[in-house]
């Protein structure tokens, strides 16, 4: 079917069933219930064999759910970003990471699924494959599966514009630990949008990785209640983390206005 063709009735019905499968699965997930093929089929009034006409396995079911969750996350952080002009990437990135935190705290089970689930044989195979390739772009920090690539690309775009505007210090190759340089070195891939800047270096990708690790670590600790509740309700730990990252990215002088954005 061409991209402009009108879906047939059968195709529309099949898509509607997929949408219902994802909706029911997410409802089960949000209520802390088992998201199994049997449970989903029961909620939909189907037999398990009937559900297998749409999904082949539990892994495929969870992949469908994960893609839907990532789409929602990217949608929310996009709305937050777009409240600020493109020539203010500092405001955009603070607004986006704050929206990500709010989403995570409000959707703990979905956060657990896409950001904190233990590896499966399928995801381990993807990770092993990715480990054989050097990271040459910011959005190459996340393997392209389950919608995670779009999430990473969203932040890599803002991060690149931040560097273009603020020119924050980036470590040279000889300042990076050997193990880090080995992972981050390699020829740029044809068509990489970042390669057109002529400025993407292992040090820049390392800065991106470190910023994400600190942000993700803080949000994960908050989501699972591994810090004092007062730090979560006040947002103090998150704000301190964003400020620490901001210092590395040349934004310390703008913290007063950015803090107001972080508090939303």
Tell me the role of every PLM-derived stretch.
Residues 45-55:
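Short hydrophobic/aromatic patch on the recognition helix
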Residues 62-89:
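Short N-terminal edge-element motif at the start of the domain
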Residues 20, 39, 92-95, 99, ...:
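Amphipathic alpha-helical interaction segments
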Residues 80-110, 146-154:
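Hydrophobic alpha-helical connector segments
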């Amino acid at each position: 079917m061409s991209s402009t063709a009108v879906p047939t009735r059968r195709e529309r019905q099949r898509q509607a069933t997929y949408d219902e499968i994802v909706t029911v699965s997410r409802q089960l997930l949000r209520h802390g219930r088992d998201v199994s093929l049997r449970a989903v089929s029961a909620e939909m009034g189907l037999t398990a064999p009937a559900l297998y006409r749409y999904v082949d396995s539990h892994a495929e079911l969870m992949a469908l759910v994960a893609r839907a969750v990532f789409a929602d996350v990217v949608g929310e952080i996009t709305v937050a970003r777009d409240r600020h002009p493109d020539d203010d990437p500092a405001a955009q990135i603070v607004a986006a990471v704050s929206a990500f935190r709010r989403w995570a705290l409000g959707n703990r089970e979905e956060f657990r699924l896409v950001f904190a689930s233990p590896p499966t044989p399928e995801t381990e195979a993807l990770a092993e494959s990715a480990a054989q390739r050097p990271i040459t772009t910011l959005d190459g920090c996340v393997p392209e599966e389950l919608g995670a690539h779009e999430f990473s690309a969203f932040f890599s775009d803002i991060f690149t514009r931040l560097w273009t505007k603020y020119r924050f210090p980036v470590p040279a190759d000889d300042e990076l630990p050997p193990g880090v340089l080995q992972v981050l070195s390699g020829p740029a891939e044809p068509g990489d949008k970042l390669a057109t800047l002529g400025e993407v270096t292992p040090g820049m990708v390392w800065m991106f990785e470190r910023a994400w690790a600190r942000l993700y670590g803080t949000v994960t600790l908050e989501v699972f209640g591994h810090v004092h509740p007062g730090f979560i309700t006040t947002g103090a730990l998150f704000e301190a983390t964003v400020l620490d990252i901001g210092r590395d990215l040349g934004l310390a002088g703008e913290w007063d206005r950015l803090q107001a954005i972080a508090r939303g």
